[in-house]
Design a protein with these regions (language model features):
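Conserved nucleotide-binding/hydrolysis micro-motifs of P-loop NTPases
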Residues: 35, 65-66, 97-100, 123-128, ...
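Short flexible coil/turn linkers enriched for glycine and charged/polar residues
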Residues: 1-2, 13, 52-54, 113, ...
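Canonical P-loop GTPase G-domain recognition
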Residues: 125-179
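Conserved G1/Walker A P-loop phosphate-binding module
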Residues: 1-72, 85-86
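Residue-level signature of catalytic and energy-coupling elements of molecular machines
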Residues: 19-20, 38, 60-62, 79, ...
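Extended helical scaffolds that flank P-loop GTPase cores
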Residues: 173-336
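Conserved C-terminal guanine-recognition region of P-loop GTPase G domains, centered on the G4
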Residues: 45-52, 78-147
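Signal for well-folded cores of large energy- and translation-related assemblies
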Residues: 24, 68, 83-84, 111, ...
Length: 336
């Protein structure tokens, strides 16, 4: 039986654990990631591919929730370290469908890793209740990876997710893509053309390699430093970076690519997501709409503060009267 290892990645509170629990006949293993006390959750189950009549032992590693591939927290450090390793075959990026744009910021970083990625648009049922509609097919075209609507609470999309895992597993390389602004795309293309001209052999696609060179990826720089092509490509990369610094008016590459990720996530969201007004709203939503109204919000706040003040003294006077009476009676008794 073939084994598929899946890294389950996503921001905090996107329903990763619920999605794991929704997988039938799951066997849960709990431990720690190597060298740290962060809990490691692993699920083992079997996927039966109906087309090939073959079974796959699938291991899902639930990575700690992270907002980005940085090392600001121990959870992000663990997630980044695992994502950069070769200990898995596929990334399943769990996304909160009710907060698409913010979640896509993390998705763009995962797409840049060069790994095989599947996007699970989780909490789709909650999104529909809020009037949010996402065109998952269009999003799949934009990202270059499968995008599947899931709802852990109802089991929606679980079978489709399993099928996608097997399908992506058999693909030789990822088709993930992130589209950048014209200046960056032009510099990427210049480097790609140079690599093609030199027939450079790389495990990464030329586009991904060019991107990592522009991002000054330490591992790529270390690997290519001792290769003959390094002397020729370094001036090209430096010129490209000079153009980017000039265009973005900063030499902070982190800031440059954060802006690019934000623009890409915002553009993708605007293209695939629509929101319709919901006629039926629950009590909480109705109260929220009333309290955050730009005209009524502040007056209502002041009214409730006044009401709280009045209730504190009016209601508080009742037990105080009883207490005063009790102490007066006790005082009288003491005099006897």
């Amino acid at each position: 039986m073939k084994q598929i290892t899946v890294a389950l990645a996503g921001q905090p509170n996107v329903g990763k654990s619920s999605l794991i629990n929704a997988i039938s006949n799951a066997k849960l293993k709990v431990g720690n990631f190597s060298g740290v006390t962060v809990e490691k959750t692993e699920v083992v189950f079997t996927i039966c591919d109906e087309f090939s009549c073959e079974n796959y032992e699938t291991h899902i590693i639930d990575l700690p929730g992270a907002y980005s591939l940085t090392e600001y927290t121990i959870e992000e450090k663990v997630t980044k370290s695992f994502i950069q390793s070769d200990e898995y075959d596929i990334i399943v990026n769990v996304v909160d469908s009710t907060n698409l744009q913010r979640n896509l910021l993390f998705t763009t970083q995962l797409l840049e890793t060069g790994k095989k990625v599947i996007v699970a648009l989780n909490m789709s049922d909650e999104a529909r209740e809020e009037g949010i509609e996402i065109d998952e097919k269009q999003l799949s075209k934009i990202l270059g990876v499968p995008c599947i609507k899931t709802a852990a609470s109802t089991g929606e999309g679980i079978d489709e997710l399993k099928e996608a895992i097997v399908e992506i597993y058999h693909k030789k390389e990822t088709t993930a893509k992130v589209i950048y602004s014209d200046p960056i795309e032009e510099e990427i293309q210049h480097i790609v053309n140079f690599l093609k001209e030199k027939h450079y052999r790389s495990k990464l696609s030329y586009r991904l390699l060019a991107l990592k060179l522009l991002q000054e990826d330490a591992d790529i720089y270390r690997k290519m430093h001792d290769e003959p092509i390094w002397i020729e490509i370094l001036p090209l990369v430096r010129d490209a970076l000079g153009h980017l610094y000039l265009h973005h008016n900063t030499k902070d590459l982190k800031e440059i690519f954060e802006e690019e990720h934000f623009a890409f996530a915002k553009g993708a969201k605007m293209e695939v997501m629509s929101t319709k007004s919901m006629k039926a709203k629950n009590l909480t939503q109705k109260i929220d709409i009333l309290l955050i109204n730009k005209f009524l919000g502040i007056p209502l706040f002041l009214f409730f503060m006044w009401l709280l003040f009045q209730l504190t003294f009016e209601l508080g006077s009742i037990p105080m009267d009883y207490i005063d009476t009790a102490f007066s009676w006790m005082g009288e008794q003491a005099k006897l």
